[in-house]
Amino acid sequence: RKLEAGNCCKNCAAKLSPWFNDRRQSTVEEIKEQLAYREANKEKVAAFHITRTLGEDTKVLLDEDAGLFMVTASRNLADANPDVLAFSDVTGCKLDIDERKTEIEYRDAEGKRQSFTPCRYAYSYDFYIVINVNNPYFNEIRFQLNDSAVDNDAETLLDGPDAVRPMRGGTRPG
């Protein structure tokens, strides 16, 4: 794996924090420092006492007695070695929403795709939490909240310009 001035073997790259993304701009010495940090982190993981779990797939694990947390999707904490951080390392938190829109079209009498006027769209969303942290190797932890896109299940190709999309959840009161 390429570094700013040198290389990092595949085994060492796998030991780096999953939240670290500046490998190519790092020196060999900086990588060695992070590997030492990650090795010391194993002891923190072993001593971590989960008092609360937040989330389904990716989880925020809290050790409220020690004021620590970690974020991981792994069931085997010893193997995953998730970064153990202090509550005081958190500098901010936000919800990040990725929106995608797909144009809804219809087939005309000749079977060709046509756009509505004005254009109609189907939307889907993915929701992410971004936890900003004070850490020498990464400054944010970003993970997806939903396990599949949240959408309105709209058909994006209708049989004709007068075709009506079924509404989910019934109608809204007047």
Feature map (PLM): residue ranges:
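Anionic N-terminal interaction surfaces
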Residues: 3, 13-83
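Amphipathic alpha-helical segments
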Residues: 84-92
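Acidic, Ser/Thr- and proline-rich intrinsically disordered linker/docking segments
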Residues: 91-174
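The −1 position to Zn-ligating cysteines in a subset of zinc-ribbon hairpins
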Residues: 8
